[in-house]
Amino acid sequence: MEPPMDPSGGEQEPGAVRLLDLPWEDVLLPHVLSRVPLRQLLWLQRVSRAFRALVQLHLARLRRFDAAQVGPQIPRAALAWLLRDAEGLQELALAPCHEWLSDEDLVPVLARNPQLRSVALAGCGQLSRRALGALAEGCPRLQRLSLAHCDWVDGLALRGLADRCPALEELDLTACRQLKDEAIVYLAQRRGAGLRNLSLAVNANVGDTAVQELARNCPELQHLDLTGCLRVGSDGIRTLAEYCPALRSLRVRHCHHVAEPSLSRLRKRGVDIDVEPPLHQALVLLQDMVGFAPFVNLQV
């Protein structure tokens, strides 16, 4: 009589304990599959029907999904299979899907996962205002959102987000080039009290009006990125220094209208600023020119 086959297709040794004989709920799911990268799960589910069922049960219980764990490029079918049963996600990162991710791909996932607290959609240029509306409407606990390089994000989309996301703390709007001062002012007035981390980098239409309103409405703001915001000047920075006592870091590189006197008050408070003071810049330049930094006596 031939020995029985195990689920993987091999022969089962008499008295042998197979992996799938271990308790799924108490052992395999919390202590084994939780440590297997998503890419390997795609291979594992092909071994047998039993392994496929185990992997599907694990995926249905995911709390965090980062598409980067699958690879730099993930096919649409693979994403749909990985997320089809997930109903308890708290973190979702889909940047590797940026070339093809559409509203039709994303909206059903959002609808099944109302507990989402962190969503990263950087570079997902095929989405539209509909997806952001579904996120704002269906995920009231949302705290962190990245929309960097999403050109479709406009003032109306941001207003909907500000109206429906009371828990929002971190927002990345880098290179959302349709946004203007009016949209940022509305965001500050509606959600400024809870904002701690905000990036408006590379938004040429954002200026002092937006920065001053953020300063007056965001007392807990800790990190602000204004890199490349060409319309931001010293007036906005002075208002930040006056109204944002919790500020820890400020990015103003390529903000050519921001002068050192407006930054000095923040430097004295220990705020990390990515632009060096003029004296340091001069010493670095001199070092580059002559090969060493001479001793400079600053005493008069």
Curated annotation (Swiss-Prot):
Residue list for modification N-acetylmethionine: 1
Cited InterPro entries: F-box-like_dom_sf, F-box_dom, F-box_LRR-repeat, Leu-rich_rpt, Leu-rich_rpt_Cys-con_subtyp, LRR_dom_sf, LRR_FXL15/At3g58940/PEG3-like
Record key words, sorted: Acetylation, Cytoplasm, Leucine-rich repeat, Repeat, Ubl conjugation pathway
Organism: Bos taurus (Bovine)
GO CC terms, sorted: cytoplasm; SCF ubiquitin ligase complex
Ranges where the F-box domain occurs: 19-66
Region (Interaction with SMURF1): 113-269
Entry similarity comment: Belongs to the FBXL15 family.
One record GO biological process: dorsal/ventral pattern formation
Stated role: Substrate recognition component of a SCF (SKP1-CUL1-F-box protein) E3 ubiquitin-protein ligase complex which mediates the ubiquitination and subsequent proteasomal degradation of SMURF1, thereby acting as a positive regulator of the BMP signaling pathway. Required for dorsal/ventral pattern formation and bone mass maintenance. Also mediates ubiquitination of SMURF2 and WWP2.
Subunit structure: Part of the SCF (SKP1-CUL1-F-box) E3 ubiquitin-protein ligase complex SCF(FBXL15) composed of CUL1, SKP1, RBX1 and FBXL15.
Signal sequence annotation: none
Gene, per the UniProt record: FBXL15
Keyword Cytoplasm (UniProt): yes
Tree of life domain: Eukaryota
Entry-linked SMART domains: LRR_CC
Source species taxonomy: Eukaryota, Metazoa, Chordata, Craniata, Vertebrata
Localization of this protein: Cytoplasm
Pathway(s): Protein modification; protein ubiquitination
Keyword presence, Lyase: no
Entry protein name: F-box/LRR-repeat protein 15
LRR repeat boundaries on the chain: 141-162, 167-188, 194-215, 220-241, 246-267
Pfam families assigned to the protein according to its UniProt record, in alphabetical order: F-box, LRR_6, LRR_At5g56370
